[in-house]
Amino acid sequence: MNSSNLEKLNCKSSIRDEVVPSRKRVTLPPWLEVAKPRLIPLLLATTLGGMALTEEWPLSSPKLICTLGGGALAAAAAGALNCLWEMELDKRMTRTSKRALPAGKLSSETVFLAAVSCTLAASMLLVSGVNYLAAGLTLLGLFSYVILYTVILKPRTTKNIVFGGVAGAIPPLVGASAATGHVGLSGWWLFGLVMLWTPAHFWALAILLKDDYASVGIPMLPSVKGSVFTAKAISRYGWATVLMSIMGVFALPEGGLLYGIMLLPFNGRLLQLINELKKSPDDLSRAKSLFRWSILYMFGICLLLLISRTQLSVEFEQQSMQIFFSILSLLSN
């Protein structure tokens, strides 16, 4: 291999190291590492988003704590079971070979017992402190991630994240059901938004890791179809995400106007980064930027939903409507 090729490989490796959580930069205890704690905050954020879409928001502190606590425990269990199932695969990938299980820092038995314990604790917390529907949906999310995505879809199809993304889209349903005892159309709206957002978000990361996935035979879209095809697919799902996000104006019980206004820069930035990647699909720095922004985007959507349910937002909407009708009245005279 000549020096030019080596430089290109080193450049790609450097960019991947920047975007993918590095054990060199953040060293977690083995027992915490297998729980995949980096994924949990966004799952809890979308749970809060589901709650904010209901008339019952805000929830009482005990119910809120039980819902988020149960969700965090279930997510930790799902992460541990995922690590357990993919232990042999992780051994074969340079990026993951030093993780707790493949490196022998934890035994399989210990991780399995911890996952079962977290699952039982999550179930008891949600059943006793929230309701059966929230508990059932949480368990559905856990098993869809472990069985549907990890075991069935991930090793078999390039559409793995399209259908497997249902696991990450269930928390809004948990939040809505925790608040009301049922899901409701607004909860399903946020479920749909997360489902559309997930492929664009994950494929941006998969572009960075396509060589890693290809080396172990995992059929991620960029590894099979290439970056150009993937960038076009990201664009389609990105536009669908933007259109779906706008529907939040109508999904909110109140405060939709302020949500719609604050949403504009989020969608504008998302489309800008998607367009930049589409122009240069092999530019790893652009894939990195899109991946990072997509995370902030979903956190931002959930924050906007919470802000829209404040009294300030309601007053803003009322005053805006008064001004609007005053202008109409002046124009008609």
From Swiss-Prot:
Return the EC number.
Answer: 2.5.1.141
What molecular function does GO assign, one term?
A: protoheme IX farnesyltransferase activity
Matching entries from InterPro entries are given as: Protohaem_IX_farnesylTrfase (IPR006369), UbiA_prenyltransferase (IPR000537), UbiA_prenylTrfase_CS (IPR030470), UbiA_sf (IPR044878)
Gene3D superfamilies from the xrefs? UbiA prenyltransferase
Membrane topology is: Multi-pass membrane protein
What's in the GO CC field? plasma membrane
EC supergroup of this enzyme: transferase
Q: Which reaction does it catalyse?
A: heme b + (2E,6E)-farnesyl diphosphate + H2O = Fe(II)-heme o + diphosphate
Asked if the record carries the keyword Translocase, the reply is no
Its pathway? Porphyrin-containing compound metabolism; heme O biosynthesis; heme O from protoheme: step 1/1
Where would you find the membrane-spanning parts of this chain?
64-84, 110-130, 133-153, 161-181, 189-209, 246-266, 287-307
**Which PROSITE patterns does the entry mention?**
UBIA (PS00943)
Q: What is its main location?
A: membrane
Q: Which GO terms describe its biological process?
A: heme O biosynthetic process
Provide the alphabetized UniProt keywords: Cell inner membrane, Cell membrane, Heme biosynthesis, Membrane, Transferase, Transmembrane, Transmembrane helix
Q: Where in the cell is it found?
A: Cell inner membrane
Describe its function.
Converts heme B (protoheme IX) to heme O by substitution of the vinyl group on carbon 2 of heme B porphyrin ring with a hydroxyethyl farnesyl side group.
Additional detail: Carbon 2 of the heme B porphyrin ring is defined according to the Fischer nomenclature.
Family under the similarity heading: Belongs to the UbiA prenyltransferase family. Protoheme IX farnesyltransferase subfamily.
Q: Which HAMAP family match?
A: CyoE_CtaB
The protein's name in its UniProt record: Protoheme IX farnesyltransferase
